[in-house]
Each structure stands twice: as C-alpha cells, then as structure tokens.
C-alpha cells in the first residue's frame, strides 16, 4: 500500500513538472476561445531584470475582432510586470511594472507575424519591432527593476499571479519562436532573429524550452519558414 502511494505521488509530481524540449519548427496552437487553456513557461534565469527583449511569432485572425494577450509575465507584486497585448482599434500595448505605452497599429495581418519588444531601465526606452521594422520609440518606467519568480503565460493575460484569466482576452491562433534575453537587442540582432537566426537567449530559449500545457493547447508544425 505504501509503495502504491509513493508511486502515485511520483506520477503526480511528473504531471506537474515542467517538460523541457527543443521546440524548433513547432508552435503552440490555441484553437478556440477559452479561460482555461494556456502554456506556462519557466525562465532559465531567476534574476531581476534591468533590460530585456522578447521575440516571438504569432498567427491569428483576431486583431480586428477583439483584444487579446500575446505575452504575460507576472510577479507576486505585479500581475502585469511585463505584458505584450493587442488592444483592438488601438494597437500594441506594451507594459512594464503596470504602466504601459501604446504602439499604434490598425491590425495584425492574417499572416504569421514576428514581434520583438524591448525595454531598458537606464533610459526607460521601450521599443517594438514588427516583422523586422521598428515602431517609434516610447519611454516607460525609467529606473524600474523587473521582479523575479515570474509566472510566464502564453494564451492568457494574468490579472493575478498565475491566474485571473478572461476568455475575452485569450489568444486564438498559433504562437512560436518565443525567446527572451536579459539585454536590449540591437537593430542588427533583431533582424537576425526575425529571419530565423539564433542569439543564445538567456531567459527563455525556444530550443530548450521548459513549459507546461493546460487545457486545449496543441503542439503542431510551424506554418512559417
């Protein structure tokens, strides 16, 4: 009986653990609107951040229909510690530590789209790049430090640490090539990543990704080069 209980506990532990996998040429597919389907990511680095860059591919038809979350990084002190969010009729909202700036756009084209967002504490400069092309720079949270022990979620926006999901803000579509660095990538580096190059990501590495899938999320081949 004790042996059976021990085996059961081991199996539960495995089911709750983060898998690590090379996700090259694959994508997470969110096929329907939901408040309980998402992917949790585990950061390779647990340190606080004075700068960062997040890059990813997204493929969705939602942008002219409603708003949705692209990348959600929460800490216990701030559910929107880092947030990349599509705001219908407004554009890309990029938040650090709660406050956000808006990069205007009328839609996300209904083709696979590459997005990079970067920020640095020293100047507060926030940048957004779409398919290798920059938006006008903004200023955001100069002097701020991004916290650690993060809950990183794809597919949902966190209104609380690891939860508080709203189906009306969920992603429907594909997301992949999610990488994150603890530096601001240069324009040349952004363009290298945009065309499929690798730059040894220090926080999230798509080629050695630690993740957990919850609900109706599937891993399928990428629909972009």
Curated annotation (Swiss-Prot):
Gene Ontology biological process terms, A to Z: acute-phase response; innate immune response; negative regulation of lipid storage; negative regulation of macrophage derived foam cell differentiation; negative regulation of mononuclear cell proliferation; positive regulation of gene expression; positive regulation of superoxide anion generation; regulation of interleukin-8 production
GO cellular component, one term: extracellular space
Modified residues (Pyrrolidone carboxylic acid): 20
Xref: Gene3D superfamilies: 2.60.120.200
Cofactor binding annotation: Binds 2 calcium ions per subunit.
Binding residue positions for Ca(2+) 1: 80, 157-159
Domain of life per record: Eukaryota
Induction section of the entry: By interleukin-1, interleukin-6, and TNF-alpha.
Keywords for this protein: Acute phase, Calcium, Disulfide bond, Metal-binding, Pyrrolidone carboxylic acid, Secreted, Signal
Cofactor(s) in the UniProt record: Ca(2+)
Pfam families xref list: Pentaxin
Family annotation (SMART domains): PTX
Domain Pentraxin (PTX): 24-225
Family: Belongs to the pentraxin family.
Subunit record text: Homopentamer. Pentraxin (or pentaxin) have a discoid arrangement of 5 non-covalently bound subunits. Interacts with FCN1; may regulate monocyte activation by FCN1.
Record-given protein name: C-reactive protein
């Amino acid at each position: 009986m004790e042996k059976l209980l021990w085996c059961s506990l081991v199996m539960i532990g495995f089911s709750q653990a983060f898998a690590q996998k090379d996700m090259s040429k694959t994508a997470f597919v969110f096929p329907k609107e939901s408040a309980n389907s998402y992917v949790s990511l585990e950061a390779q680095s647990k340190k606080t951040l004075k700068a960062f860059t997040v890059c990813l591919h997204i493929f969705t038809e939602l942008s002219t229909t409603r708003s949705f979350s692209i990348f959600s990084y929460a800490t216990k002190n701030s559910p929107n510690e880092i947030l990349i969010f599509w705001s219908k009729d407004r554009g890309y909202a990029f938040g650090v530590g709660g406050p956000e700036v808006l990069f205007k756009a009328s839609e996300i084209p209904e083709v696979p789209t590459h997005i990079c967002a970067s920020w640095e504490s020293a100047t507060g400069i926030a940048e957004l790049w779409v398919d290798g092309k920059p938006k006008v720079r903004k200023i955001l949270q100069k002097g701020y430090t991004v916290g650690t022990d993060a809950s990183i979620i794809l597919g949902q926006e966190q209104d609380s640490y690891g939860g508080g999901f709203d189906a009306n803000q969920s992603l429907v579509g594909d997301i992949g090539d999610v990488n994150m660095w603890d530096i601001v990538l240069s324009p040349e580096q952004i363009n290298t990543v945009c065309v499929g190059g690798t730059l040894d990501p220090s926080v999230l590495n798509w080629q050695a990704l630690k993740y957990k899938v919850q609900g109706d999320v599937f891993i399928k081949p990428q629909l972009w080069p």
